[in-house]
Each structure stands twice: as C-alpha cells, then as structure tokens.
Regions:
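Terminus-proximal functional modules
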Residues: 10-109
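Bacterial N-terminal signal peptides
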Residues: 2-12
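Solvent-exposed, well-ordered amphipathic alpha-helical segments
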Residues: 1-2, 85
Length: 109
C-alpha cells in the first residue's frame, strides 16, 4: 500500500512540476504491472487539469496472453491520448521480476 502512495505522490509531483513550465500542458500515464495481489496491475492517467483515470490491467504473469492483453490495452490508451492532441515527450521505466513500472509524459499540442 505504501508503494501505491509513493507512486501517486510521484505522479502528482511530476504533473505539478511539469505544469509550471510556461504554457505547456502535460498529461502523465503511469503503468504498473505487478504479479502480487496487494498492488495489482493498472494504468493511472492524470491530465493537465488534475483529472485522474484508472484503467485495470491483468496481473503480471508468465503467460503470453497476459502480456499481449496488457500491451493491447496500453497501446490503445496511448493512441487515444495521441488522438486528443497530445504528443509523447518522455518515457521511462524500470522494475524487477515482480513489478514493472512505466511512465509516459505527454504535452498538449
């Protein structure tokens, strides 16, 4: 649970810090794919107005279908964001065998 709080704090910090750069409006997507039941797998989206949306993903496993299903959901979501006039400006990720974190930062065009 502490990990979720830290993640939300970081998303909030990135969104607030990035929003102070001139007239740029940022949208941040945090993808968490975890194998443990306590955290779960999900995408959290925070737009330039602070509006939050969460999209559930399948729990991380070694099954190819899980990776495929999650990748399709992530890809469709990123495409929808692009269709709304946002451009991807940064991506980072990390993790271990139990959890994968990926952050996408978009700027509104």
């Amino acid at each position: 649970m502490g990990l979720v709080a830290i993640t939300l704090l970081l998303v909030s910090f990135v969104t607030n810090s990035a929003g102070n750069e001139g007239n740029k409006e940022f949208l941040t997507v945090k993808v968490i794919e975890a194998s443990g039941a306590s955290l779960g797998s999900f995408m959290m989206i925070v737009d330039e107005n602070g509006k939050e949306e969460t999209i559930d993903l399948e729990r991380l496993s070694t099954k190819k279908t899980t990776f495929t299903n999650n990748l399709v959901t992530i890809n469709n979501t990123l495409n929808k964001i692009g269709d709304k006039g946002y451009k991807l400006v940064a991506q980072s990720g990390g993790g271990d065998q139990y959890c994968i974190f990926t952050t996408y930062t978009f700027v509104k065009q």
